[in-house]
């Protein structure tokens, strides 16, 4: 890029030195602003909503024409003396041997050699320039964005043969940074063009890049841009009152920003943020600057400091939390550009650039553990952004080399020991699973590792029936894996995937719902990791606003308005990000007619339990009689492969059991599920028994699942052979005994009263 810009400058100097005249080209009056070369705006692809046109400039260059080939033949060599003993020798004969004539002509045109000096000095008068020269640094330069390999840690090459030599699974080693960087920025495009909405201040630049675009709901605004090794830029486009407004924000290495045309200088004209290594600049017109200043009033220096003084992963997590706020407050999809959304998109793009800069400045090798953490968070950020900006497009930031490295690491991971890992080591493993997620050969081990982590989280959860912050973070990582895996697998064809959904559903109960809605209701906990709920991975389909409000109001000191705010926020998040869909299940093919009636699905190895509001013809149906008045509820056992049930179909009564004997050394209830439902609100929760510890905790006195004081809650036990029983515990026995004793006492009192009356009457 620098060589190209230098050649353009030389062309201009050559014209000036020999007094020649270049080829004529009219000044562009309609800036070309397509999303990517040759593409138009479509849903899910880059582009712009309308044909962009700008007001023609009043100053136009004088058209001149000359044969540049003839000029080169007359002056085959040119010496340019820039002073300070700096000279450049330009041999045109050698140049035309390497560069096609058409390209030389294009460079000649972009050098604007036909312009008069007066026109050159005046053509940028409408381009916005700062009033004062930027003098003081914005913050200070830090290297927190760089993933350096620690002393003593090994380095590996990433060729197909050598990648297998990797022995570590924890990412504490280095791999070649230039190779990874080439993968992440693999596309080649015209990143900058004179006709772009950058007001003709740049030369054409073709470079390796990643590209993105986001639209707003009003279809009149769009933001799009590129990420390269040297810089990244975002152009905001707004259609207002029949005119397009443009604002380009660029961030990059100070000494590697694209060369400006003419007499424009970054430091005196455009810089809004700078430290010892990076700079942020804005490019627009005076009129457009006034428009965007009133519309979004951006804090460029604050954005610059955040991006350059904090680790990229920290900034990315903050952006993820902002997405939660937009979802919970019903602002998704984003309808229009505002200060919040404008700054979000800038940070979104420049966070990707800082990840690139971390690779660029890491030297020869980059630390895998740190790199995977950043790329994992960026992947999640892109997925969340896609739910809030419609349409959203992103191309780039994939790497086959990284996938190969991650696959070897997954192979080396001692999955059976994952339950003994610290939270930090689990974080690293889950990030590795995400990077290896697109490798088909690694699928089985990825799901196995995820299931082991889920099982351990669930087991620990039953000790206190409370999810720790670290555990919610790990559930989030598994959730990200499921967003991809659900497209490739069906639950009952993979035991580990089934365990993941069963344990997630078991942690989605009334306590969990009220906890999350309570945090969202105070509007101060828009944290993705604090508010992430296993309900987003459950196979429950009974979530409604009214149900969530009902669960939330059970909390003390919870007003109806707060409960409604929290429940609405949780409902919006569930609607946007709930990964479990009915079509995911193989059994869905024979239950399509009942899709609207299904409340919950409980998959087991050979059969599937379906909780619904209607009986299912091909299964064994258990009519739940003690249910709420508004709707009926059935628990149906259906063969997972949609075959005929061995014992035939039909409706059966649910037998009642008062006492369950549990072995102290074995786990007779393992593989069974317990279902709780309320007479008024219906389905409450489900718990699946995975091991003895879970079995013991479910029946402990501290368990909130069996509420001995609530006479309106009922419990069913679902066996893996299709049998369903109702459990009536001690509270039912105590109720019956209480009623009998009460009747006996009342009878005695009535008898005594009657005897007293007879005695008085007789006497």
UniProtKB/Swiss-Prot annotation:
Cell location: Virion membrane; Host cell membrane; Host endosome membrane
Specify whether Cytoplasm is a keyword of the entry: no
The cellular component terms of Gene Ontology attached to this UniProt record, alphabetical and capped at eight, are:
host cell endosome membrane; host cell plasma membrane; membrane; viral envelope; virion membrane
Residue numbers on the Virion surface membrane side: 23-739
Transmembrane helix found in the keyword field? yes
Interaction with gL: annotated span: 219-283
Q: Where is the composition biased (Polar residues)?
A: 31-54
Q: What does this protein do?
A: The heterodimer glycoprotein H-glycoprotein L is required for the fusion of viral and plasma membranes leading to virus entry into the host cell. Following initial binding to host receptor, membrane fusion is mediated by the fusion machinery composed of gB and the heterodimer gH/gL. May also be involved in the fusion between the virion envelope and the outer nuclear membrane during virion morphogenesis.
Q: Name one GO biological process term.
A: fusion of virus membrane with host plasma membrane
Instruction: Specify the glycosylation sites in chain numbering.
Output: 67, 84, 91, 112, 136, 148, 157, 241, 557, 606, 641, 659, 721
Keywords attached to this entry: Fusion of virus membrane with host cell membrane, Fusion of virus membrane with host membrane, Glycoprotein, Host cell membrane, Host endosome, Host membrane, Membrane, Sialic acid, Signal, Transmembrane, Transmembrane helix, Viral envelope protein, Viral penetration into host cytoplasm, Virion, Virus entry into host cell
Q: How does it sit in the membrane?
A: Single-pass type I membrane protein
Mapped to this chain, the residue ranges on the Intravirion side of the membrane are 761-763
The entry's family comment says: Belongs to the herpesviridae glycoprotein H family.
Q: Which organism is it from?
A: Equine herpesvirus 2 (strain 86/87)
Q: Which residues cross the membrane?
A: 740-760
InterPro entries reported in the protein's UniProt record? Herpes_gH, Herpes_glycoH_C, Herpes_glycoH_C_sf
What does the record say about PTM? N-glycosylated, O-glycosylated, and sialylated.
Assembly with partners or alone = Interacts with glycoprotein L (gL); this interaction is necessary for the correct processing and cell surface expression of gH. The heterodimer gH/gL seems to interact with gB trimers during fusion.
Q: Which positions carry the signal peptide feature in this UniProt record? A: 1-22
Q: Where is this region: Disordered?
A: 29-56
Q: What is this protein called?
A: Envelope glycoprotein H
């Amino acid at each position: 890029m620098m060589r190209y810009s230098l050649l353009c400058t030389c062309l201009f100097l050559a014209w000036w030195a020999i007094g020649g005249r270049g080829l004529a080209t009219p000044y562009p009056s309609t800036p070309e602003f397509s999303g990517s070369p040759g593409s138009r705006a479509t849903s899910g692809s880059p582009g712009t909503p309308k044909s962009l046109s700008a007001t023609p400039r009043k100053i136009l260059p004088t058209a001149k024409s000359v044969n540049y080939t003839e000029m080169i033949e007359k002056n085959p060599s040119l010496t340019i003396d820039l002073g300070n003993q700096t000279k450049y020798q330009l041999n045109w004969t050698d140049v035309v041997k390497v560069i096609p004539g058409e390209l030389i002509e294009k460079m000649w045109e972009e050098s604007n050699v036909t312009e008069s000096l007066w026109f050159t000095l005046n053509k940028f008068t409408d381009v916005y320039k700062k009033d004062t020269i930027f003098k003081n640094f914005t913050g200070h330069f830090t290297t927190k964005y760089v993933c350096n390999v620690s002393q003593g840690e090994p380095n590996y090459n990433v060729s197909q043969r050598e990648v297998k030599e990797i022995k570590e699974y924890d990412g504490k080693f280095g791999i070649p940074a230039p190779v990874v960087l080439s993968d992440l920025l693999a596309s080649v495009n015209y990143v900058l063009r004179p006709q772009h909405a950058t007001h003709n201040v740049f030369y054409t630049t073709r470079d390796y890049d990643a590209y993105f675009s986001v639209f707003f709901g009003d279809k009149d605004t769009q933001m799009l841009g590129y990420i390269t090794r040297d810089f990244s830029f975002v152009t905001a486009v707004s259609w207002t009152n029949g005119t397009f407004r443009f604002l380009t924000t660029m961030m990059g290495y100070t000494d590697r920003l694209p060369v400006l045309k003419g007499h424009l200088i970054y430091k005196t004209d455009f810089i809004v943020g700078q430290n010892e290594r990076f700079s942020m600049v804005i490019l627009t017109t005076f009129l457009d600057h006034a428009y965007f200043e009133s519309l979004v009033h951006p804090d460029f220096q604050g954005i610059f400091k955040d991006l350059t003084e904090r680790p990229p992963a920290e900034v990315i997590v903050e952006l993820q939390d902002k997405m939660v706020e937009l979802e919970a407050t019903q602002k998704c999809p984003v309808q229009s550009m505002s200060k919040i959304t404008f700054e979000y998109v800038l940070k979104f793009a420049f966070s990707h650039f800082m990840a690139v800069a971390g690779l660029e400045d890491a030297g020869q090798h980059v630390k895998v553990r740190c790199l995977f953490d950043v790329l994992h968070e960026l992947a999640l950020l892109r997925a969340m952004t896609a739910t809030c900006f419609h349409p959203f497009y992103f191309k780039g930031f994939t790497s086959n080399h990284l996938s190969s490295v991650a696959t070897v690491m997954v192979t080396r991971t001692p999955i059976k020991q994952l339950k003994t890992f610290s939270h930090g080591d689990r974080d690293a493993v889950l990030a590795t699973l995400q990077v290896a997620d697109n490798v088909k050969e690694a699928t089985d081990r990825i799901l196995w590792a995820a299931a082991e982590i889920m099982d351990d989280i669930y087991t620990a959860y039953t000790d206190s029936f409370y999810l720790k912050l670290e555990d919610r973070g790990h559930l989030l990582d598994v959730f990200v894996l499921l967003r991809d895996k659900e497209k490739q697998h069906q639950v009952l064809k993979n035991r580990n995937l089934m365990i993941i959904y069963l344990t997630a559903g078991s942690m989605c109960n009334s306590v969990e719902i009220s906890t999350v809605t309570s945090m969202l209701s105070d509007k101060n906990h828009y944290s993705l990791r604090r508010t992430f709920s296993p309900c987003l991975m459950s196979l429950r389909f009974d979530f409604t606003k009214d149900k969530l409000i009902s669960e939330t109001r059970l909390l003390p000191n919870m007003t109806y308005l707060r409960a409604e705010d929290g429940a609405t926020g949780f409902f919006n998040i569930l609607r946007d990000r709930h990964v479990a869909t009915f079509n995911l299940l193989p059994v869905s093919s024979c239950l399509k007619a009942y899709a609207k009636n299904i409340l919950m699905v409980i998959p087991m190895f050979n059969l599937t339990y379906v909780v619904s509001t209607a009986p299912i013809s091909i299964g064994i149906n258990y009519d739940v009689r003690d249910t709420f008045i508004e709707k009926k509820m059935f628990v149906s056992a259906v063969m997972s492969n949609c075959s005929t049930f061995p014992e035939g179909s039909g409706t059966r009564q649910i037998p009642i059991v008062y006492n369950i004997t549990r072995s102290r050394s074995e786990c007779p209830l393992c593989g069974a599920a317990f279902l709780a439902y309320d007479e008024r609100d219906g389905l409450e929760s489900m718990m699946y028994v995975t091991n003895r510890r879970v079995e013991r905790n479910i029946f402990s006195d501290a368990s909130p699942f069996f509420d001995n004081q609530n006479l309106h809650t009922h419990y069913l036990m679902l066996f893996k052979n299709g049998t369903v029983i109702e459990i009536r515990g001690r509270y039912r026995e105590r109720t019956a005994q209480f009623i009998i004793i009460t009747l006996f006492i009342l009878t005695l009192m009535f008898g005594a009263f009657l005897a007293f009356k007879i005695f008085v009457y007789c006497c």
